[in-house]
Amino acid sequence: MPPLLLLPAIYMLLFFRVSPTISLQEVHVNRETMGKIAVASKLMWCSAAVDILFLLDGSHSIGKGSFERSKRFAIAACDALDISPGRVRVGALQFGSTPHLEFPLDSFSTRQEVKESIKGIVFKGGRTETGLALKRLSRGFPGGRNGSVPQILIIVTDGKSQGPVALPAKQLRERGIVVFAVGVRFPRWDELLTLASEPKDRHVLLAEQVEDATNGLLSTLSSSALCTTADPDCRVEPHPCERRTLETVRELAGNALCWRGSRQADTVLALPCPFYSWKRVFQTHPANCYRTICPGPCDSQPCQNGGTCIPEGVDRYHCLCPLAFGGEVNCAPKLSLECRIDVLFLLDSSAGTTLGGFRRAKAFVKRFVQAVLREDSRARVGIASYGRNLMVAVPVGEYQHVPDLIRSLDSIPFSGGPTLTGSALLQVAEHGFGSASRTGQDRPRRVVVLLTESRSQDEVSGPAAHARARELLLLGVGSEILQAELVKITGSPKHVMVHTDPQDLFSQIPELQRRLCSQPRPGCQAQSLDLVFLLDASASVGRENFAQMQSFIRKCTLRFDVNPDVTQVGLVVYGSRVQTAFGLDTHPTRAAVLRAMSQAPYLGGVGSAGTALLHIEDKVMTVQRGARPGVPKAVVMLTGGSGAEDAAVPAQKLRGNGISVLVMSVGAVLREAVRRLAGPRDSLIHVAAYTDLPYHQDMLIEWLCREARLPVNLCKPSPCMNEGTCVLKNGSYRCECRGGWEGPHCENRILRGDAPMARSFHQEPAGLQGPTPSQQAPKHLRIGKALSSAK
């Protein structure tokens, strides 16, 4: 045949070519839920009497690689089966051109033997004769119990059978056999749906996603009471999912001339012939996928103050904390009990509180102890629980270390029974604090903290009065519906802390810490704050008055919990020049701050308040010098009034950048320049004389606490260095760096080199300098960067 005459045959071959397909199943859930699905599959257990047969497709269309994935799915499913002769029996049959029994159901009596046998199955190849394999099973499961127990058939195939499957599959289902169709490689979903039992959504899975497929299989079996979960709070939920197929289809692209022979001798006809192009098109099939979800360690939202909870397995987690709260277990502010006190936590363990409420109470005490107790603390703690009877789990002070106390707390069991709060209070009054019988100044203050979520079933007024008569301070923590009863027990509304939502319970920790000591220091101990004092050290103030200012700010500092996680304090003085006495991150403790304040220099000369405020904006209130993103910031300026003529604009610039400014002006006359500098009326405190400063201390603390509670803008002041731009996004921020800089805060100069890890070790090219100290990331940001890169 002439070559030209072969063209039609070639075109016909292309036209009728079978196109390849790519299939995929995707469950539409977030990453956290996907992690819970994976964890839940490890918490499920099938221990009922049941016969399970794996029917593995070993044909050439599967291929050896996909066959190994089929075996991996079968092995993973066996991990949840209680395999024994009297409970779960497992067998395996491979099919290709013909079915081949790998091992019957009565061959092995342990899970490990079954898993080893599945692992040793050899791929055989051949045609995909699914129908023949199903017909063989019509005579019964090899080694099975003849239908006296439920029968489960798990078909793992690509759904490309070369024979009919609908009738033999229907016959098996009519005999009561539950059929799962598990796709592998690029399955045909329509054939899998034909094979599977009803409801189809619960019996069609994809073996390529082993943990998801195992969860789906066990979830369906649990609805038939064949499987259970270790946690009673686990539940089966439907999730939208999508089965997608990427099909290659042909489209008419146009016509071209081709030559054909004719009936007339020596004649060739030129005719238009169509030609085609190939195009890939997604075909989607929406469905519901039923999966078991178990409560995760992050469901209780243990990370406070905007921290992000990262689960680590079934019951462990860690918190990614904002910079202001780094280093703490649950991003909790560092608090302390500085008074000498004995505290007994009394936990309601009755049926009215429920197991969930009892666990919340234990979590509350655990967080409180972790937040406030130190090894050198003068406070001692004990823990007791009650329902029908009182049980003292940890007598007051009888523990070696805080971790020992926490371990004892974790081991306290839930007792149930009636809520006999009155009886518990009587026993606590008599025996709750051991043999401590000292009185007066020799005995620490004794406090009982009652945590309950249910009303007492016995009388409480008399026992509570008896406890208070024995010099016990009673504090009550509970829900709003119990407020009246808690007031009756404690004797005062001031001794009651209520919450509207169970999760709000944990927000009471700072308030409880404040109330425990007999003389709680006023202020906002739990509020984070970056605070800078600006002192006028010019000649117009004088050395003696400057000393009065120093004494005043030292007394104010005593009202704050100074540490890198709560309140940071800096000090700037100005006169003949502007000088930073110490920055925000210079001194991590209150004692060090007080000592440095006493050593601040008196400068003399003529001062410029405007220059000093600009110095604070450029050299003090920056992330390079210790300011923390997302933490309220305030400047308290103490001045005699002179030198304030140029300060109004710099003060307004600070306020526009998210930094609050309060002016304390000392002198008989309030100058107009100071009024303009103060801005809003509530940002000015006028003091008649330097000796009167202590009388305005409470007013200053109240203003600072009010500013500390205001919402903050994470980009004001900007945490981005080297002229980077701060962009708010989803409750956080990111830095867009200018050319030549990179890093979370644009702190790293981009150098030439093959790998980022090698840049810091390369010799810098001539004329190219590394970042100056002001351009480098401050310590607290470098730590954050190291953590993020480690992740």
Swiss-Prot record:
PROSITE patterns membership: EGF_1 (PS00022), EGF_2 (PS01186), EGF_3 (PS50026), VWFA (PS50234)
Domain VWFA: 51-221, 342-516, 530-704
GO biological process: calcium-independent cell-matrix adhesion; regulation of insulin receptor signaling pathway
UniProt keyword annotation of Repeat present: yes
Gene3D superfamilies: Laminin, von Willebrand factor, type A domain
Signal peptide: 1-23
GO molecular function: calcium ion binding; identical protein binding
Subunit structure: Forms monomers and multimers.
Protein name: von Willebrand factor A domain-containing protein 2
Organism listed in the record: Mus musculus
Gene assigned in the entry: Vwa2
